[in-house]
Structures are given as C-alpha cells and as structure tokens.
Amino acid sequence: MNSAILSRPACNALRGLAIIGIFLHNYCHWLGPIVKENEYQYFQHNVDRLNQVMASMDLNLPVHLLSFFGHYGVPVFLFLSAYGLVMKYEAKPHLSTEQQTRMYNISGKKLTGSINWREPLHFIRYHYLKLFKMMIVGFVAFTMLDLITPGSHHYAALDIVAMLGMFNNVLPNPDNIIWPGPYWFFGLMLQLYIIYRLLLYCRHWGWTVGLMLICIGIQLILGFDNPESEAMNCYRYNFMGGMLPFGLGILYARYGEKILMTFHSPITNFFGCIFCISLIYSLSLNMIGWTFVPFFICLLCVLVAEMLQDIRWLSGIYKVLEWMGSISAALFVSHPITRKIFIPISRHGDIYAGLLLYIIASICIAWLFTQLMKKIPNPKY
C-alpha cells in the first residue's frame, strides 16, 4: 500500500477544480447558441461546432469551453472517491472489534466455506445513507422551486422512488426521468460503491485493470456501432462509463506515481499541464480518443494541484480551490436551484450578467447548505 500521495488539502483543491467545472458547465450548456458537450454520447457535430468557435473566437469562448469540457469534473470526483475508499478501508485498520466479528470467528481466522454478506451490506448501507444525506436537502428544495417556476418537470411516482433509491440510472430513457439532471451522479456512485466492495476491495490489481478494460472494450464496441445511440447513452449513465477514472483512483491510491506520473518541479508540472491540455483537446476530436479523455483529465488536475501547491505566489488560488472543495457537496446539490432562477437572464441576451449572478448566488447558497447539512446526523458504519 502506498502512503498518502494526495494530502487532505490537495484532495479538497481537486474537488474544488471538479465542482467549478461541473456547476459552470451545468449552466453554460443550457444556453441555446453555446457548443454542447459529449458527456454520455459522442456527437461529431458537437466537435465540429467546437472547432468552428475555436477558429473564429469571440467573447463567448470561455462559455463554449466550459460547456464542452466542464462535465469532466465528474471523472475527477470518481477518481477522488476511489482514492478515498482505498485510503480509508485498505491503508489502515478501520473496523471495530464488533465489526470484525462479522467477518472473523473467535480464533481470529477468516471464516471459510461460506460467503459472509453482512459486512458488504453494512458497507453499502452506510455509503447509501451518506449519499442520501447529501442529496435529500437539495432535492426537496429544488422540487419545491421547480413546481412554482415555469417549465416544471412532471415526475412519475416511479421516478421519485428511483431517485430516492438511487437506481434511476438503470431505468430506460434516463435523460427524461432524472431531474435535476446532475443527480444522476448519486446512482452512479452507489453502483461504484457496490462494485468496489464486492469485486475490488483488497483484491489483486488485475481485478481492477480487468474490469476497466472490459468496460472500455464494450464502450468502444458501442461506439463503433453508433456512438450517438441510446444504448451508448444508457451505458455511460451507469458504472461502466465511470470505471476508467474510478479504477484509476484505486490504482493511484495503491501504487502512486507508478500510475500517474507527477513531478517535483513546478516548471515540469507546468509543461505536463500544457501537454495534457493539448492531448485532451486532440483526443476529444474522435470517438476512440474521447473514450480515454478522463484519464488525462485526472492527470491534469493532479498536476495543477501539485503546481499550485508548490508555487508560493499562487497559494491564494490554491486556498480558494481548497475552500471550494470544502463546500463542493453542497454546491453540487444546490446549484440546480440557482440555475433555474438566473438562467433566464442569460437566455435573454446578457450571458455574463446571468452567469455572474449565478456564480455568486450558488456559492452563497452552497455555504448555507453546508451549515444545514452539518446538522443532519452522520450514518453509523
């Protein structure tokens, strides 16, 4: 087991980078004339449109780039979640004596001849409740606002149950039933927690790599058939679409720089960032390369965090990212609320006025939600 490569402040800074990309993307991509992303499916016309705006840049270029690339904050969250799981459950003893008795007999030898499901079920229940605690406050607030504002979503009973049970990702046509849209992440995370505990926990690295290769292989097969298909959409809504960054986080926690090469020189890290940015853009131009972009997104974010941490005059930016990471959970669940309030301003022509008000309000509401979520008791393992 590798010692902690990413410190707690570094993890928070990475969360800050990720949530900034996500909450800005989720505003920008709802604006009509702005370039759309290839998040669940690969659309060549979106890539062609990106190339057009890059060839003839205007004042909306930052909005175009946030719309197209901002969703890659999700793979960074998956990477960090996997990293945290390994550091928490594999790097040190974490079970109490009572919990260990569920897995071991009195003699201390591991029970054999039968599968003990109690501990995995406790693990899954614990992480489901953690996700539920984070989701429920934002979901209740959003649904009330959604009902009293124009364009409210029509929920079916099954949609609500699936949202609260976090199995909405597996239902047909997830685009039409998951509302607010970013909440698909909770079902994805629950699936990955289950996969980790049942298949990858304390297993040989070959299990992780094998599952990553299988998921990537199936995605490539779907892509060669029709990268715009509903089959591709449903596939990437579920754990298979997030297995690359999640598996990468597991391997990075265990093996460190053997998996993601970072450097101890800010200059070298800077050129590493330039290389990653160039590679991310070029890989995004075709379906095969698009499949592997999350790998380089994770590497880029780690390099950026390392660079900001090492350069003294950039320490202010690092502290801002670290603070943003500390409110990232609340910002994730609350930003659909502020988006629905402020996006009409941008849609009626003043893009940056609406965006600026959205940013200010979202951060303030996220801070308030953070204080509220602290009042909800944490689940017990």
Range-by-range predicted roles:
Residues P9, L61-V74, P174-L188, F224-L248, ...:
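Interfacial loop-to-helix transition and helix-capping segments at the boundaries
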Residues Y83-P93, L198-H204, G223, L248-L260, ...:
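Structural signal for the C-terminal ends of transmembrane alpha-helices
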Residues F246, G272-P377:
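Alpha-helical transmembrane segments of multi-pass integral membrane proteins
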Residues M1-G217, R347-Y381:
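Membrane-cytosol interface segments of multi-pass membrane proteins
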Residues I20-Y27, L164-V170, M212-N226, G272-L285, ...:
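Aromatic-anchored segments of alpha-helical transmembrane domains
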Residues N116-L121, A141-G151, M166-I177, F224-M232, ...:
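Short juxtamembrane and helix-loop transition motifs at transmembrane-helix boundaries
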Residues H204-G210, M261-F271:
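Membrane-interfacial entry segments at the cytosolic side of transmembrane helices
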